[in-house]
Amino acid sequence: MKSIIKIAALARVLLFVCVCFSFMQSLHADDGQLAEAYPPNVVAENFKLSDITGEMHELEDFRGKHVIINFWAMSCNICKSEMTTLQSAYELLDNENLAVISIHAGDPSDGVKSVLELNGIEYPVLFDVDLQLGEWGIPILPTSFIVSPKGNIRYRTVGTRVWNSPFMIDFMQGILDSDEPQAANPDPI
């Protein structure tokens, strides 16, 4: 009887390890791909959403700049971690032709302000309370889009990214330095 209990306990531990390993693999499944290139001339749909103070913002306000739009939710812990790397990348890139916007899926009253303050997030965080931006093709959170100064979607990232990693900084700098589409899978050296 004791051996059956030990075998059952070992099976639970092995199952737990397998689930954890599988989860971690899914987070890093596309590390080799920094971003998915979009077909040319796919126009980003305009939106009008409020920030935490109630001020309204629309995508059109950022026309003329490259814009990273990051979709996230409070219930997504990896989303909150990604936001800090996005803030750091924004500071490292320090480019007047770059804007970052985060769009929270849901109500602003669920502790968002404290998370933003705690993590030093300075870029605009908007609220999609009615979840009206579903047409953006967001399979999971976080998902981000890189929009050109002309308003076309150039790239999409699905899942978490370490935006302040050397590879992502180089990738973004290449986008900022050129109006030509950049290869979405540069060879990491």
Predicted regions and their residues:
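Bacterial N-terminal signal peptides
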Residues: 11-22
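N-terminal "domain-start" segment that seeds a small globular fold
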Residues: 28-59
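Conserved redox-active cysteine motifs that mediate thiol-disulfide chemistry
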Residues: 63, 71-88
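Alpha/beta-hydrolase fold active-site loops
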Residues: 66-67, 142
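Hydrophobic beta-strand anchors of alpha/beta hydrolase catalytic cores
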Residues: 68-69, 100
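Structural microenvironment flanking redox-active thiols in thiol-disulfide oxidoreductases
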Residues: 80-119, 130-135
